[in-house]
C-alpha cells in the first residue's frame, strides 16, 4: 500500500501531515503534479512532475494506482477513476469517496458546472480550516491503523 497525492491543489498543511506519516510509519508517499514540488529529504517521499495539461497528473495517478492504495484528492472524477481501480480516495477535508456516494457527487459537480456556465454565482467551497486538517489527520490515522501501518 502506498499513498498517492494529487498535489497540484492539495493544501500545504495536508502535505505536511503526509510527510510526517511517511517517515513515522515508513509508508511511501508520492506526490504527482504538473509543477515542480519541494519535498523533504526522505526515502519514503517522492515527487513526480508531469507535463502541463488538462488532467495529465490525474491520468498519471490512475495509471499508477493499485488496489488498496490511498489517493489524496479533491477531484471527484479522479476519485471515481481511483475507485474503479480498487484504490481508496480521501479528500483533503478527511472525507472518503465511496462507490455508494461517488455517482451522486459526480452528478452534483456536473449540475454546479452547468449553473456556473449559465452565469449563476454558486460561490465556492468554504475556506480550508484547522478543523479540516484535524479531520483529515484523524481519518488518515484510522485508515492506517485498520491497514496495519
Curated annotation (Swiss-Prot):
One Pfam entry name: DUF188
InterPro entries per record: UPF0178 (IPR003791)
Signal peptide: none
Residues annotated as transmembrane: none
UniProt xrefs under PANTHER family: UPF0178 PROTEIN YAII
Family classification: Belongs to the UPF0178 family.
Name of the protein in question: UPF0178 protein HEAR0259
Organism taxonomic ancestry: Bacteria, Pseudomonadati, Pseudomonadota, Betaproteobacteria, Burkholderiales
Amino acid at each position: 500500500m502506498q499513498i498517492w497525492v494529487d498535489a497540484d491543489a492539495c493544501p500545504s498543511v495536508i502535505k505536511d501531515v503526509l510527510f510526517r506519516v511517511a517517515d513515522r510509519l515508513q509508508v511511501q508517499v508520492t506526490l504527482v503534479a504538473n509543477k515542480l514540488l519541494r519535498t523533504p529529504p526522505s526515502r519514503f517521499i517522492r515527487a513526480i512532475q508531469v507535463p502541463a495539461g488538462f488532467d495529465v497528473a490525474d491520468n498519471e495517478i490512475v495509471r499508477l494506482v493499485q488496489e488498496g492504495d490511498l489517493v489524496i484528492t479533491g477531484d471527484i472524477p479522479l476519485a471515481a477513476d481511483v475507485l474503479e481501480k480498487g484504490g481508496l480516495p480521501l479528500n483533503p477535508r478527511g472525507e472518503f469517496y465511496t462507490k455508494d456516494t461517488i455517482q451522486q457527487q459526480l452528478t452534483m459537480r456536473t449540475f454546479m458546472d452547468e449553473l456556473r456556465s449559465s452565469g449563476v454565482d454558486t460561490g465556492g467551497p468554504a475556506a480550508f480550516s484547522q478543523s479540516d486538517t484535524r479531520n483529515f489527520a484523524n481519518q488518515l490515522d484510522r485508515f492506517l491503523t485498520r491497514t496495519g501501518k
